[in-house]
Amino acid sequence: MNMLALTIILPLIGFVLLAFSRGRWSENVSAIVGVGSVGLAALVTAFIGVDFFANGEQTYSQPLWTWMSVGDFNIGFNLVLDGLSLTMLSVVTGVGFLIHMYASWYMRGEEGYSRFFAYTNLFIASMVVLVLADNLLLMYLGWEGVGLCSYLLIGFYYTDPKNGAAAMKAFVVTRVGDVFLAFALFILYNELGTLNFREMVELAPAHFADGNNMLMWATLMLLGGAVGKSAQLPLQTWLADAMAGPTPVSALIHAATMVTAGVYLIARTHGLFLMTPEVLHLVGIVGAVTLLLAGFAALVQTDIKRVLAYSTMSQIGYMFLALGVQAWDAAIFHLMTHAFFKALLFLASGSVILACHHEQNIFKMGGLRKSIPLVYLCFLVGGAALSALPLVTAGFFSKDEILAGAMANGHINLMVAGLVGAFMTSLYTFRMIFIVFHGKEQIHAHAVKGVTHSLPLIVLLILSTFVGALIVPPLQGVLPQTTELAHGSMLTLEITSGVVAVVGILLAAWLWLGKRTLVTSIANSAPGRLLGTWWYNAWGFDWLYDKVFVKPFLGIAWLLKRDPLNSMMNIPAVLSRFAGKGLLLSENGYLRWYVASMSIGAVVVLALLMVLR
């Protein structure tokens, strides 16, 4: 257990070494340092896990030093290990190591090879700080760290202005959520005098027993932070554009780890949310709406990575739904299995993109199953897990637990939303697979091979099957137990969800394996074009936010750039200057001008006297 800090220190050392190498190292040396540091962190995590189970799954705390101490305000840099943080740590370092190994192959020949691994090592260190922190402020440090790394990696190919814009968009939108999280910190410390997770849960019931509604505001702010980082409604607009980064980044940050940080935040502060059931129910509604909207958006995308981005948004929606119906174990279980099959799909999509000479439009591909059979198998298994194909995939078991939790706790409407989402998931997933790997070959794909390419894919492929579902997160005693569904009802639900998934796959085969005449006619109809455009543009949220927030903000910025306050202060000076110029013109030395001026002045004075009388 004393090795807990090494899971942060090792990737941090890798970051420092790679950063100071300034690209002078060869790709092999950079890969050894970048991949090796994360691999060692994963190995340390394995030792920690063995020790954790050997000691009866007891919560362990490792104080490192006092971070801040001002009067009564004391924040320690303390790490905590329990079943929840161990699960997250295993996902971050384990799946992270596999993705780093794959990236050492994928990024070969790219400019900034060592810079890439420096950023990803810093990300792993920040993510580990986030999941091991024993207090909200230390978690916030890791939270901001992963946000910075996300920005750097989305804009990795910074010479293209579009990538820079995508990075800035992700940074700004997620910062909105971070502001909400900061407000939550202020409220909770002001009310409870501590930010330690355990102490907050212990003090909250007595402190808020008198009906103080500040706890509701605090949990709403926590939810605001969670939806920003986890790309949920209404702060979901950044994730699809984040696909501008290298594909291993999409797998590491925007599928398996960082985007699930919001789920972890709510799970870690579950004691506070249980005291505000209205906010907890809102969490479930946010998840249900997001999973449906993202599912329809994924159905019409043409970019292979954007399909997977919207599917990520949708699957995190399932996790939020699970949290909202108090199916805590199911949420974390799905977080883990999702990391397996979504990392597999993203890495396999990277192989497709390289094999097709960096083409990402699925309609310009086709017939690739013969050229890259291993990648095709990865897509089949990963797609089946994403679609929750019954019995043989990890996704089936975790998603069914979520639906069972919703049904057992009386949230039938959310369960129905989950079933509709399951149908949409299987439909858009196998639409992508059938278009890319079946039909007529439209592009000559070259073979992709190599140990560092194939080994991570094979490991993730195995974990995406029912084998991954055998890994049960040790959450007993950390999160409240989920209400269990009666055996008969559970069997009915499993059959129903299985049928829904299979029907979605069969419908996808009928629509996209043949000549696609029906799909074409629907797409070319007036309603089809309207809905297709609407869904393709993610329900118009970007357009709405541009009109409501971006354009007014830019208008205000344009106005402030010209310093209106200073201009107003100059008005008296300008008027005085014009008056002075007028008086100078009147002093011209002509007698007739003076007589005329006096006459006009006299007439004006007489007129005023007559009017005022």
From Swiss-Prot:
The lineage of its organism: Bacteria, Pseudomonadati, Pseudomonadota, Gammaproteobacteria, Enterobacterales. The chain crosses the membrane at residues 7-23, 32-52, 75-99, 116-133, 211-228, 249-267, 282-300, 307-325, 339-356, 374-397, 414-437, 455-472, 495-514, 590-607. It holds the Pfam family Proton_antipo_N. Its main location: membrane. NDH-1 shuttles electrons from NADH, via FMN and iron-sulfur (Fe-S) centers, to quinones in the respiratory chain. The immediate electron acceptor for the enzyme in this species is believed to be ubiquinone. Couples the redox reaction to proton translocation (for every two electrons transferred, four hydrogen ions are translocated across the cytoplasmic membrane), and thus conserves the redox energy in a proton gradient. This is NADH-quinone oxidoreductase subunit L. GO terms for biological process: ATP synthesis coupled electron transport; electron transport coupled proton transport; respiratory electron transport chain. It catalyses: a quinone + NADH + 5 H(+)(in) = a quinol + NAD(+) + 4 H(+)(out). Residues 24-31, 100-115, 229-248, 301-306, 357-373, 438-454, 515-589 are cytoplasmic. It is a multi-pass membrane protein. The gene is nuoL. It comes from Escherichia coli (strain K12). Residues 1-6, 53-74, 134-210, 268-281, 326-338, 398-413, 473-494, 608-613 are periplasmic. GO terms for molecular function: NADH dehydrogenase (ubiquinone) activity; quinone binding. It comes from the Bacteria. Keywords: Cell inner membrane, Cell membrane, Membrane, NAD, Quinone, Translocase, Transmembrane, Transmembrane helix, Ubiquinone.
